[in-house]
Each structure stands twice: as C-alpha cells, then as structure tokens.
Amino acid sequence: MMRPYEQRFPWNLDWNLLRTFMVVVEQRGISRAAYFLGLKQPTISAALKRLEDTTGHALIIRKPNEFSVTRAGSILYQECSQIFGSVSQLPSLLESGAEELRGHITIATTSHVISDHYDDLLHDFASAHPKVTFSTTVAESESVVSRVQQNRASFGLCLLHKIPANLKAAILYREYFGLFCGPRHPLFTQERITLAEIEGETSVSFQTETEEGPLYPVAQLRARAKLAPGWRGVSSSLHELRRMIVAGVGIGALPLHAAKRDIESGLLRQLPPYDALPLVNIYLLTNPLRKLSDAETVFLSACHAAIKDNTLEARTYQ
C-alpha cells in the first residue's frame, strides 16, 4: 500500500525539474547546462534546489572545480532518462495505424560502423517508406548501450565486451583489424617491412582498447607487435584515429575493409603482422522492454531479416 506522501509526490512535483536535472548530469555542470538550455545559471541552480527539496535528497555535490552525482542523484537520473525516452517515443507511437508507414527512428551508433549490408538495408527501407525520418547519435559503445537501456534510442550499433543481461544483441557484421601507418611515417615507403622493425614505435589507440573494453583484442595486437608502451594519441572516433595515423602521429589499428580506399589512394599502408589478426563483432542492440512504433517494428524486422538471409561469413569483412 502506498504511503500518503508517495501518493502526493507526482502531483507536487514540477516535472520540468526532471528535464533540467537530466541536462545538468549529462552536461556535467550547472554552467554548461545553463548554456545548453539557454537559461541563466541562477535559474538552473534554483531549479536543482527545488528538486532536492521536493525529493528530500541531495542530488548533486557542488564544490569548486568538482562535479559529482550522489547515489540518490544517480537513481533519479536513470529514471529521468527512461521517462525522457518514453516521452520522446510519443510522436512515433501516435503515428501508428496510418495507411502509409510514418514515424521516427533514433539510432545510437559507434563511429566505425562501415557495412555494405547495413547501407543497403538503410537505402531499401528509406526508399520503401519515404515518410519515416531518422536521427543518428554517434557515441562510444558504452554510451550506446546506456541509450538503448534508457529507452532513448530505437536501437544501437556498437561493440560489446559482453552482452548486457537486459538487452538483446545480434551480430550485424564482423571485421578484422590490422596495423597501419601514414605517408609521413619513415616505414611507409620501405619496400619490405618486418614485424621486428615496428617494435618500439609510437602508436595511437581507440579509447576502448583496454582489458575490459570491447577492443581488447586490438590491444593484444599492439602488444604482439611490441609497440611502445602507452599511446601518443587516443580517440573514440575512427575518423579522428585515421587522421592521426595519416598525419604520422603514430601507428594505429583500423578495420581492414575501412582502410582499403585509403590504401589505394596512398594514404595508408598496412604493417605486419598480417596473420591471426583480431576479429571483432559489431552488434545490433535492442531493448525488449521498449514499446516499438510501427516504423521501428518494420525497420528492426528488416534488420533481422537481413542478418538471417546473409551468412555470418558473408557479413565478415576483411
């Protein structure tokens, strides 16, 4: 049985405060949240104080040069994100039942999703359903997982170290990674390069090349090549990592199929080793608790059909 104060809470709460609080957490500060929302800092501070008074809990620890969320604040943020995700679905859900398929599909993806199969699927769906719109957010794999968990994305495309228990994942495609250097690197014009010659070379890295990260096999490739410990440059973006490799900041790993055009253009050269290269899965991630709109249902059905109709071998790029 609900307590009296629990029954009053949703009626006493100014729901706009939840949106403000969510932005404060995501922007990691009151000043940045104020800029994002187009409001003044005192307005944001007052809203946060009102929300803390309403909930009866401190939500943000505010100290000079420090921003942290309390345990209560973390719980509230997760709930706010799910509420925001549900509300953001309403326009698409209200389109259900229209004679012509309408709605909006929100995609959360990592930066290095390069797949002819996915591109063909997207083209075919967009051509068949011209009234459906799309928005894509590019983020690290961890953030992609969070967006799908919080119901803020129709689905996600990302790397996974392990499949989250509350989500469903299917392999969209697989890709091999190799080491590359750019035209400004001393080894680029050398006729033949041995594995021993790249030992001790500086390198650039994806942020997820860690022991608990989804690109740990790539970190093992760097260790196998005995590159210099640590990295000289790091990024979560394939495009920025490629830029650093081409600019000669260091040797780095890229998906083989993503590097082909640059190899042909003389911007990249693959380095040893050439055998037993790491194979990494890119997943289609969905939330079984999400109430799908008609557009999302049809699109995800097309995704699963494409996965079923093409063998994993055919979806393995090298």
Enumerate the predicted regions with their spans:
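Short helix-boundary/capping micro-motifs
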Residues: 22-40
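A short LG(V/I)-centered, amphipathic sequence patch enriched
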Residues: 52-71
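Alpha-helical linker/hinge and terminal dimerization helices associated
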Residues: 54-55, 76-98, 303, 310-313
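Central regulatory/effector-binding core of bacterial HTH transcription factors
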Residues: 102-165, 318
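A late-sequence structural motif
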Residues: 117, 269-313, 317
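Hydrophobic hinge/microswitch elements
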Residues: 140-145, 149-153, 158-159, 209, ...
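Flexible hinge/capping segments at coil-to-helix
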Residues: 168-204
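Secondary-structure junction motif
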Residues: 201-226, 292-294, 300, 310-317
